[in-house]
Design a protein with these regions (language model features):
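Compositionally biased, intrinsically disordered low-complexity regions
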Residues: 9, 21-23, 37, 48, ...
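Acidic, low-complexity, intrinsically disordered interaction modules
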Residues: 28, 32-120, 124
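Short acidic DE-rich linear segments
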Residues: 130-135
C-alpha cells in the first residue's frame, strides 16, 4: 500500500529535515512515521492525553508547524497560557515570519513555494482571528 506519491514523500521528508531542530527542541509534540498511515503529528505533553493527527500532505505538515511557531511567539509555553488566539501584531507577525523563513530557506529547491504558502497562511490566520473587525 502506497501512502504517498514519491513527489509528496520527498516534499514531506524535506520539510521534516528543515524543521528537525525545531521539532527536537519541543517537548510537547513529535512527528513520527508509520508504514500504515504515513507521517503522524503526536501531542505528547501529557502522558495518557496524547492526540494524533495524520499528515497526509506537505501543507498539512506545514499548517501544524506554522501554527505551533505562531503560538510560541504569541504565548511562549513557559510563561503564559494561550487562552484565545488573536490576530498577530506587527511585531509578532515579523517574529513569526523571521523564525519560519529561516527554517524554510533550508529546504532545497522548495523554499520559494513554501515561502509563498507562508504568506497565504499568515493572511488566512489574520482573517480567521480578525473577528469581523477589519484593521
Amino acid at each position: 500500500m502506497m501512502i504517498y506519491t514519491d513527489d509528496v514523500r520527498k516534499k514531506l521528508d524535506a520539510i521534516l529535515k528543515a524543521f528537525e531542530n525545531y521539532i527536537d527542541d519541543q517537548n510537547y509534540f513529535d512527528i513520527v512515521y508509520s508504514k500504515k498511515i504515513g507521517y503522524v503529528w503526536i501531542v505528547v505533553d501529557e502522558p495518557g492525553a496524547a492526540g494524533a493527527e495524520q499528515l497526509d500532505t506537505p501543507e498539512a505538515m506545514l499548517d501544524n508547524l506554522f501554527n505551533d511557531i505562531i503560538n510560541d511567539v504569541i504565548a511562549p509555553r513557559s510563561t503564559t497560557h494561550l487562552d484565545e488566539a488573536h490576530t498577530l501584531t506587527e511585531s509578532e507577525e515579523a517574529e513569526c515570519r523571521r523564525k519560519i523563513t529561516a527554517i524554510l530557506e533550508q529546504i532545497e529547491g522548495g523554499a520559494d513555494e513554501y515561502l509563498d504558502y507562508l504568506d497565504e497562511y499568515i493572511k488566512d490566520y489574520q482573517e480567521r482571528y480578525a473577528g469581523g473587525s477589519k484593521s
